[in-house]
A protein has these predicted regions:
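N-terminal alpha-helical signal peptides/signal-anchor transmembrane segments
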Residues: 3-28
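Intrinsically disordered, low-complexity regions enriched in Pro/Ser/Thr/Gly and acidic residues
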Residues: 45-166
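Extended amphipathic alpha-helical segments with heptad-repeat/coiled-coil character used for oligomerization
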Residues: 24-57
């Protein structure tokens, strides 16, 4: 149940960030926190909001989420894992990105901890309009590949997910 709820939450956030894509023009090359703006505009499900916290939201699995515009080119959703939910969260994110691949330029997953093991995958997966023979395509990811990619991150690591709209 919680994983399905989490998937609905991320769908709402990611599609909401698409609606806010014009904000990136105002961001310049600065890291801008838009979590508060998305909360105030109704772009975040109410169960993800904790009173007294306006810079972060929480998903159904208890992961803390920061949403920002990191540059002119992409939104960044940083997920601080709450225990051993990271692999399941990663699988949800990649599965959702695969579904949204016609609208995405790229989904980039990476562990944020300096001591995080490197993955066998590039961890950059491209949407339908930007996918080439030499690039990893979101639409071509198999369930087994999604499992292998997410398992390569290990546990208890922060995961940075970059959603790039073009």
């Amino acid at each position: 149940y919680k994983l399905n709820k989490q998937l609905v939450q991320y769908t709402t956030i990611i599609t909401g960030s698409y609606q806010l894509a014009r904000l990136r023009d105002a961001a310049g090359n600065k890291n801008v926190n838009i979590t508060r703006f998305m909360i105030n505009s109704g772009g975040v499900p109410s169960e993800m909001i904790k009173p007294g916290f306006s810079n972060y939201i929480w998903d159904a699995m208890g992961n803390q989420i920061y949403i920002g515009i990191e540059s002119l080119y992409f939104f960044k959703i940083t997920i601080s894992q709450s225990g051993k939910t990271d692999v399941l969260t990663c699988r949800n994110i990649l599965s959702l990105s695969k579904e949204l691949s016609p609208m995405l330029w790229q989904t980039h997953l990476r562990p944020r901890a300096e001591d995080a093991p490197s993955s066998n995958y590039d961890n950059r997966f491209y949407g339908d309009n930007y996918c080439t023979r030499s690039a990893s395509c979101l639409k071509n990811l198999t369930p087994l590949q999604i499992m292998e990619i997410c398992d390569s991150f290990g546990s208890n690591k922060e995961l940075s997910m970059r959603i790039l709209w073009k």
